Structure formats: C-alpha cells, structure tokens
Amino acid sequence: MKKKLIYAAVVSALLAGCGGSDDNKGDTSSYLDYLLTGSNAVGPSALAARAWDGTLKFSTETADLSNPVSAMSTLDGWSTTQAIQIVPVTSSGITVQAPTTAEFGASVAPLYLLEVTFDSTALRPSGVKKVLTYGVDFVVAASAWQAEPGSAQAVEPLPCLANDSGHRTAERQSRRCLKAGSDYGNYKNNAGSNAQEQTINGLIALQEGLFKAATGIATDHVIFSDWFGTQSGADVLVAVKGAAASVLKADPVTLDAAKLWKQDAWEHQPARHLYPGRDRPTCLPDPAGCRAVPAAEQKDAIATAFGPVLRSTRLLKRPRSIPVPSSCLTSSPHRRPQVPGARPRPSPGTVPSQPVRHRQCAEGVTRSDRRAGGGGRGSGPAGDADCRSDPPERAAGRGEQADWGDAHLRRQAAGRRAEHWSLQPAADAGRGAIRADACLRQGCPQHHHGCHHLSARRDLGQRERLRPGAGPDLEDLCRHAGGQEGGAGGDRSSAARRAWLRLSGSMDTVTTSDNPTPYLNLSYLTVARDNLKQSVAICWACVWRLAWPTPRAIGTAGSLKVHFLGHSLGASRVPTCCGRQPDHRQRASGCPVQVRYRWPGHAGSHSAAAAELADFGPTIKMGVLTSGSAELKAGFTAYAPNCTDGGAYLLRQRVPAEPGRGHSATAATRCRVQLCGPVGAGFG
C-alpha cells in the first residue's frame, strides 16, 4: 500500500525508498516515533506545546526562568529557519532514502509541506493556507544525525517559514519502506479512554482531515502527522529591546542586567503574549510581500529611550511620518539546495537587512567610481559588490557543482561562496537607504563570520583594501554553528576549547560532543530565550564603552552612533570589530570618533574577549546560573577581577591579525560602527 506522511507546522520530510541488500527491498519494519519518547523523535511537535497557551513545554522545566530549559519554555514556537530532522527507527542494515527530485514531479509527490492557518483561540490548525513547492520552498536532504547511516533526513526550508504560523508535511512511501509506528496507529484508530488519548486522537483526525481537503489524499494512506508553530527571533528581539528601553527610561543612569532580564521574562513575552489573540495593531508593512513588522510601538519606545544610539541617523534619516521599510534577507544555510539551480529566496524578516542595503548602495556606484576604487575586481567596496553579484546562471551552476561534484568542490563552494549567494537584493527594499557620502564613501564592505568563518576570512582578506571613509559592517550569518568547515570553526574548535578552559579553569565551560550547551549559551548564561537577553546586554556594554566623550552618555551630542541589529548564537561574537580612540575633531556631518578596526580573529575567541569588557564583568557574573555547577561558578568568580580594569580596546582579539589585511587604511577611517548579528528570523 502506498503511504504518506504529514507534518503540520514546520515540517519534516518523509523518506521514500529503502537501501540494503535485495532481500531487504520489501522491508516495512522502519517507522517514525510519535510520542517523543525515543532518540529518534527529534522533530518539533504539537505534543511539546502547552494546551492552554501554545508555548513550548519541556519536562525538565522549573519555575525559575534563570533555568535555560524553563526560559526556552516561554517560546511560542520553533525557529523559522531550522531544518527539521526525520530519523526513522530502522533495523540493522536497513536504510530509508530521501525521495528524489523525479519523485516530486509525479502526480502524487512523496512529501508535502503545507503552511496552515492557525486558530489562536483553540491553539490548533484550522485550515491549509498554502501547499509549498519542492525546490522552491523546501528541499529534502540527507542528514548527519547519528542514526543508522543513510537513514536520517532533513527538510530544509529555502525561504524562512512563515512566522507565528503553522506548517504541515506529507510524504508518500513509494517502496513501502516506512510504516506507521504502533503509537501513532493506536492513537489514530482508537478514540481513547482518557482525556489525553482523546485529545491526541482528535489532533490526528484534524491533521489528516486538513491534509485530505488540501490534496485529496485519503487518510488511510497517511502513516504520520503532526504540526507545530513557528516564532521569529526578530519578533523576540523587538520585545527584548522594548524591555531594555523601558528599564533605561525609568532609570537612565544605569542599566541593571538583572532588572532587565526580570522585566523581560515576566512582562515582555514575544509574539502573541504581546498582543493576545489575532487583533494586533497595524504595523509598517515589509516590502515584497513580507510579513508586517511587529510591535511598532515597541520600536517607538526604543527610539525614544535611546535616540540616535539605536537608530543611526545616517541609516534611518527620514521624517517620523514616513514609514521606514524593513527589507528581506536570504539566509545562507549550512547545506546548499539539493536541486540543481535551486536558490534560496528572500526570507521574511522584521529588521532592516544590511546586506541588501549595502548591496543596493554598491549597485548605485558608477563604473568610473569602481575604477577609482583601484585594483580591479574585489579591491574596494565597489569591487566587493562586483565579487558578490554573480549572474544567477553562474551561481546556479556553482550550486549544482556544490551538491553533485566531488568533495573538494563541495567544500570550496559551500565555504567560499555560500555567503555571497545570500546577498541578493529584494524588491523595494529601501534602495539608497545608505548613500555614499563623506562618512560612508563607497558603501560598507562586510565582515562575515559563522558557519563559513574561515573561508570568509580567506575570501574577504583579498578584498579588504579599504580607503579612508569606508565603514566596515560586521554581519553574522544566520544559523551559523561553527565547526561546519572541517570541524574548524566556532566554539567547538580546539582553539576555542583551550581559550575557555584557560578562562574558567573548568571543563563545564568547554563545548564538546558530549556537552554542546556552552556553545549554545545554555549552560552558563541566562540567555535561553533565543540568546536575545545577552545580545541586549552586549549591545549596551558596547554603547557604554564607545559613547565618547563621556562613557554611558547614551544619545548625547558627540557620542558614537552604535546601531545593533540582531544577535549571535555564540557568546558575544557580534562585536568583533574594534578598539577605540578619542577624536574630538567632530565634523559638521556628524562623523563620530576615530575607530581602529581589528580583523576578526577566530570565532571562538570572541566569547572570551567579551569578558574583558570593563563594566561587563558584573553582567557575566550575574549571568552564571544559580543552578550551575560549583566549579563553573568558581571559575567565573575567579576571573571576575579581570573584568574591572579599563582596557585600551573594547574587545582585545586573542588571535593576531594576519598579514596583508590592509589595516593601515581602516585605522585612519572615521566612521560610525554598526554591530550586527543575524538579521533573518529564527534561532540563529
């Protein structure tokens, strides 16, 4: 019998086809866990959501929101950018292969991904909004999950999934390699003897009914169904910044991290907690059909509290009555699409996309200006834009080569070019928002770090010949995880492990394969809510140290304009930018202090470097979980005195700058600093 899989809300892909010997081709012993009880049950699920408010619920949570698991339980849904793992339970020697592109061209596809409408009162799907298209909206790829080799699969969304929404998927079992699990079959076919069983039976009936209405596929062909909601990290960021604004407005002298986190945890929940139900205020629309910007009044509160510090006047210099659009950004995923020529599309974002703006600014530079940049392609900011703006057919060709070529080409394409694919302009994304002028002469070259950190350093190093007046823009790629390039990047690197061990003297702060939580910032800082609380603390720590002539003089005349956008999954990776030097020769155009830029070193050093921030040590100390291990707390306590001395640099890089990086030009630059994290939606 042909069988299908449905996932509602973000989805997971079902797997068509078996591997192994000829004797195993007809095997039907493989199945999917449903009740989230086994190691194979790794996908988001409606079963992990509270019935009364839709927030996530984890069995190990407590009432203390400084507990990371408990803080994560305040989330309204799963990331809009993450790939969904599907790990079948298989017998030894049996593999379940991903469906092929050809199978998706059949009249009945092996997998369906659907976006569903969500009833915020009943907290469950109420209909199907859209059946998403394979190769356009999502792809199915092999996963490196530690299961039977070749069995694990992942559904990789190409644009971000819709925020504050639900999704579903369905797959067809063309070779009968997957069957319904016994738990799913029991709940589906039996009404149940208690309230829990009856509720699950009703959910399965609802999910399969909606799928049949949208596709015409009968429920007896469905072997699995589930749904879950999504939440954008950008929505949460707006809420957290709003909390910071309210705290600082009430007490403009100091920003107490503990007070901020308490306010955020109890009074500034994201998404529907900000606006119960579906009746949200009318907000500024995103261009190109993107979702409306949430919490407009929160943005106003932020602007009122922080003035030009958060809103760079050069970036957003418009009358208050004129809407400032938020543009779209295509994230750079870890894996390229598994379909030749498939390219990610702009994803819904709720914060302005710096790459898009800089790209469009560079597009406005004339050919003579490009020649004036010197050195030809890649030698200056305009050449930098040229290097990023490859024709679609060439980029598609590289994408095919990256997916289907040999291992060396895959590594080269994924590591060296993936970040360039993301820099595609979105329609009506605020062209000219950043213009070449005395302060930003030729646009803003970008420094990347993240999953392609080492390759980005190598590639950008060839294009970093900046002239005075060019302002580097530090961008963090969405969903970076480090260690993706031969296991060398991120906090999982050996250099990072050594740095953290020296820092705290405890292995509890070191990320290993057995202990990934330090990398996720979940073991030592109260930043579980999408790591956003720490990003706000980092932002203001940077503002304090950069706000000349008087530290902490936020928004005062002559203070440095710092525009912080987003967050970084790793600890304090965003502000890898600079030391600072006072410069009292303020121009009429508003150029702030002179800034000396340091080439971003190895990503793993940024977390340790943040601890050297004067005035930031207490914040780190406060962030140590009260429930953390004794040696972890002792390690930070011993290191705390190192955080109180006034350093010459905002962040002192532990990795020396490599030769040939053109620092002499950037050292003479007089421009504002923009500290940027991921500008897409999701968990980073």
From Swiss-Prot:
The keyword Hydrolase applies. Keywords: Hydrolase, Lipid degradation, Lipid metabolism, Secreted, Signal. Belongs to the AB hydrolase superfamily. Lipase family. It is found in: Secreted. Optimum temperature is 37 degrees Celsius. Retains 90% of its activity after 30 minutes at 55 degrees Celsius. Residues 321-405, 462-493 are annotated as: Disordered. The gene is lip. Monomer. The active site is at 568 (nucleophile). Optimum pH is 7.2. This is Extracellular lipase. GO terms for molecular function: triacylglycerol lipase activity. One of its GO terms (biological process) is lipid catabolic process. Residues 1-48 form the signal peptide.
